[in-house]
Amino acid sequence: MVCSVVVALLALLSLSGLEALQHAPKIQVYSRHPAENGKPNFLNCYVSGFHPSDIEVDLLKNGKKIEKVEHSDLSFSKDWSFYLLYYTEFTPNEKDEYACRVSHVTFSTPKTVKWDRNI
């Protein structure tokens, strides 16, 4: 009985230690297909390698939040860091700018990464 309590206590302590680890997210913004003006496509924001899991991700068009955005379930890697994919349908053109804005405890202010149509 005492042994199982000690094991449970050690397990809880090791899990609480994970919360102390903080890793900033890597942010990648790209289109599903090569960009062609006037041709529908998908804009993706892949956020990976972050810890803890609490994160806010917004896709932006000309600096304004895009409302119709979908995302994958929160998943974790072998190293216990997390990753997510946010995406939306869009039609690229010469005038509109797209970006991904991420808020995470490791950033003092939200980080915005612009979509580069040439990537």
From Swiss-Prot:
Disulfide bonds join C45-C100. Its main location: secreted. It is found in: Secreted. Residues 1-20 form the signal peptide. GO terms for cellular component: extracellular region; MHC class I protein complex. Belongs to the beta-2-microglobulin family. Heterodimer of an alpha chain and a beta chain. Beta-2-microglobulin is the beta-chain of major histocompatibility complex class I molecules. This is Beta-2-microglobulin. It comes from Cebuella pygmaea. The lineage of its organism: Eukaryota, Metazoa, Chordata, Craniata, Vertebrata.
